[in-house]
């Protein structure tokens, strides 16, 4: 029996797919989607557009005669997606994936009951695709927030932090196996440990930094309200050369009233304090943030506050999302803003983000830098990362640290040439 997994969404889903492949490999032949008889769709439910896309994909696969197992967040968010699937497997039932496949073949059954499983304890089973030098390591499931626009909470639930020792062991195994970039992922890395009584992310980073070998760690998204409360300890942990000086800190709006409506539990000032502290502590920090445009209560004045915040704090990456109502969330009960207004606000913010990104990157042109090559690209050019996680397109073998000279840049990446190839 041939089984394939198709993954959508965040790095947490990618890590979940690695675990499922491990369980499946002992029972089935893992194949491409084209050759598979059963396809597991590991779904994302962040926005309505993605949900519709996934449902269409499931219907297409069924028309081809394939059985479809729905996994991921839509198992708890979308009744329509569940109705299309031949079986379903929620994120806290990954160890039952073999049963879910047999259920799709022999009689529909849903594996969606609420359970707590420490996914770090399954890490030794992971079957990663050796496409690059990156290993994704989950550190927790769920979050402490109650954002009024977010449906992911329905799928992932309250925060459950995984065993620190098991996480460190997984990172150590990955480094020994040749992976050079460890990506720590969760719905909110800054909340790690808080369900156990204290903030434990800095301690986790210190322990991973002590692993022997040359590698880098990318810390995933953390919310401002957690980062600001452990700022000194967090910056101290980031001082290790093994930790990318990369900070993904979503502000979502530049207006505190909108943040209250979103139930974000932080202020604009919290975000600014964290960004300024990191920039004052390190020579080069890559700041990434998220903005939702067109939230139902966002006025024109509120939007321009978001615009001015981005203009003033100059993040390198701004993930811009046009608000879309998710069924069952408090925000879905509010009157929506017309689509053309959302589109126009998104365009203005995108133009600003591209301008700032280009200006931020120009200062590196002409410099020689040591980078880690992490992914294969096209036409002999691969993706590498600076110590700040800034993207560099260059030559070099995946998994190797190389010296490059930056020749040019775009708003979202630098273009480098191997220093050894520079004309004398």
UniProtKB/Swiss-Prot annotation:
Residues 129-359 form the Radical SAM core domain. Its cofactor is [4Fe-4S] cluster. It holds the Pfam family TRAM. It is an enzyme of class 2 (transferase). Keywords: 4Fe-4S, Iron, Iron-sulfur, Metal-binding, S-adenosyl-L-methionine, Transferase, tRNA processing. CDD domains: Radical_SAM. One of its GO terms (molecular function) is 4 iron, 4 sulfur cluster binding. Its EC number is 2.8.4.5. It catalyses: N(6)-L-threonylcarbamoyladenosine(37) in tRNA + (sulfur carrier)-SH + AH2 + 2 S-adenosyl-L-methionine = 2-methylsulfanyl-N(6)-L-threonylcarbamoyladenosine(37) in tRNA + (sulfur carrier)-H + 5'-deoxyadenosine + L-methionine + A + S-adenosyl-L-homocysteine + 2 H(+). Binds 2 [4Fe-4S] clusters. One cluster is coordinated with 3 cysteines and an exchangeable S-adenosyl-L-methionine. Residues 1-106 form the MTTase N-terminal domain. Residues 362-420 form the TRAM domain. InterPro entries: Elp3/MiaA/NifB-like_rSAM, Methylthiotransferase, Methylthiotransferase_CS, Methylthiotransferase_N, Methylthiotransferase_N_sf, MiaB-like_arc_euk, rSAM, rSAM_horseshoe. [4Fe-4S] cluster 2 binds at residues 143, 147, 150. The keyword S-adenosyl-L-methionine applies. [4Fe-4S] cluster 1 binds at residues 10, 44, 73. Catalyzes the methylthiolation of N6-threonylcarbamoyladenosine (t(6)A), leading to the formation of 2-methylthio-N6-threonylcarbamoyladenosine (ms(2)t(6)A) at position 37 in tRNAs that read codons beginning with adenine. NCBIfam families: MiaB-like-B, MiaB/RimO family radical SAM methylthiotransferase. PANTHER family: RADICAL SAM PROTEINS, THREONYLCARBAMOYLADENOSINE TRNA METHYLTHIOTRANSFERASE. Belongs to the methylthiotransferase family. CDKAL1 subfamily. This is Probable threonylcarbamoyladenosine tRNA methylthiotransferase. It comes from Archaeoglobus fulgidus (strain ATCC 49558 / DSM 4304 / JCM 9628 / NBRC 100126 / VC-16). The lineage of its organism: Archaea, Methanobacteriati, Methanobacteriota, Archaeoglobi, Archaeoglobales.
């Amino acid at each position: 029996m041939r089984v394939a997994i198709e993954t959508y969404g965040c790095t947490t889903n990618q890590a979940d797919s690695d675990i499922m492949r491990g369980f499946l490999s002992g029972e089935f032949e893992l194949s491409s989607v084209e050759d598979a008889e059963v396809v597991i769709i590991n779904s994302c439910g962040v926005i309505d557009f993605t949900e519709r896309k996934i449902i269409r994909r499931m219907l297409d696969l069924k028309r081809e005669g394939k059985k479809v197992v729905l996994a991921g967040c839509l198992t708890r968010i979308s009744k329509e997606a569940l109705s299309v699937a031949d079986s379903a497997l929620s994120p806290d039932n990954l160890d039952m994936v073999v049963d879910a496949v047999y259920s799709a073949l022999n009689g529909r059954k849903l594996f969606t009951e609420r359970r707590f499983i420490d996914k770090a304890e399954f890490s030794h089973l992971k079957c990663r695709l050796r496409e690059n030098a990156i290993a994704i390591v989950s550190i927790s499931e769920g979050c402490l927030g109650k954002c009024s626009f977010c449906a992911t909470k329905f799928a992932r639930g309250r925060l459950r932090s995984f065993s620190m020792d098991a996480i460190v062991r997984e990172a150590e195994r990955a480094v020994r196996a040749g992976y050079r970039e460890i990506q720590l992922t969760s719905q909110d890395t800054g909340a790690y440990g808080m369900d156990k009584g204290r903030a434990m992310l800095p301690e986790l980073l210190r322990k991973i930094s002590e692993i022997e070998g040359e590698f880098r760690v990318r810390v995933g998204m953390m919310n401002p309200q957690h980062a600001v409360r452990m700022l000194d300890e967090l910056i101290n942990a980031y001082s290790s050369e093994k930790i990318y000086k990369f900070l993904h800190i979503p502000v979502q709006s530049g207006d505190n009233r909108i943040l209250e409506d979103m139930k974000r539990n932080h202020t604009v000032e919290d975000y600014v304090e964290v960004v300024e502290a990191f920039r004052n502590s390190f020579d080069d920090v890559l700041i990434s943030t998220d903005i939702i445009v067109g939230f139902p209560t966002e006025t024109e004045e509120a939007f321009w506050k978001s615009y001015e915040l981005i203009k003033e704090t100059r993040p390198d990456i701004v993930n811009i999302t046009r608000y879309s109502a998710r069924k069952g969330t408090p925000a879905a009960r509010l009157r929506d803003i017309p689509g053309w207004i959302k589109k126009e606000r998104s365009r203005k913010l995108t133009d600003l983000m591209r301008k700032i990104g280009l200006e931020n990157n120009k200062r590196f042109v002409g410099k020689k830098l040591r980078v880690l090559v992490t992914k294969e690209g096209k036409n002999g050019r691969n993706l590498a990362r600076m110590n700040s996680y800034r993207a560099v397109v260059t030559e070099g073998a995946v998994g190797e640290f190389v010296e490059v000279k930056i020749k040019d840049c775009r708003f979202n990446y630098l273009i480098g040439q191997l220093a050894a190839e520079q004309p004398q």
